[in-house]
């Protein structure tokens, strides 16, 4: 979880992290990270997008993102993902990296809620 010292700080510029009380309960996620050699994940979250829902075009700005790689693991639902003008249909089970420093968006084109696990890791040439 992202942490700031006080309300005047922008979370997008904070490198501080705190594990949530549930962090150690997600044993399958830890196994998944280990299978890809990911030892120090940064921020991570599960996101739900309802049928027909969209995440509008945006860039993840702020100093936090400058040295992080962003990954998605699609768990449920089918969605259209667009990054820098390139579109892909993402099916459950798809694991991918993309540059969140470029314009990106998502649209749930499936018939169930999209559930995706999104996480960042410090940039490293050995990342998946």
Task: Label the predicted regions.
Residues 54-62:
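Histidine-centered catalytic micro-motifs
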Residues 56, 72-92:
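A short beta-strand-loop-beta hairpin characteristic of the jelly-roll/cupin
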Residues 89-104:
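Conserved metal-binding segment of the jelly-roll/cupin
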Residues 12-14, 40, 89-91, 125-128:
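Catalytic phosphate/metal-binding cores of nucleic-acid and nucleotide-processing enzymes, i.e., regions
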Residues 48, 63-80:
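Short, conserved beta-strand element in jelly-roll/cupin
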Residues 31-55:
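A short glycine-rich, His/Asp/Glu-containing loop-to-beta-strand
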Residues 1-38:
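Non-heme Fe(II)/2-oxoglutarate
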């Amino acid at each position: 979880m992202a942490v700031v010292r006080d309300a005047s700080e922008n979370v997008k510029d904070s490198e501080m992290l705190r594990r949530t009380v549930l962090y150690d309960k997600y044993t399958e996620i830890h196994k998944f990270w280990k299978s890809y050699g990911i030892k120090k994940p940064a921020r991570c979250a599960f996101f739900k997008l309802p049928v027909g829902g969209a995440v509008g075009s945006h860039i993840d700005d702020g100093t936090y993102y400058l040295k992080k790689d962003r990954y998605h693991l699609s768990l449920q639902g089918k969605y259209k993902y667009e990054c820098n003008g390139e579109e892909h249909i993402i099916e459950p089970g798809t694991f991918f990296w993309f540059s969140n420093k470029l314009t990106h968006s998502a649209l749930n084109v499936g018939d169930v809620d999209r559930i995706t696990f999104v996480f960042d890791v410090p940039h490293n040439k050995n990342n998946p």
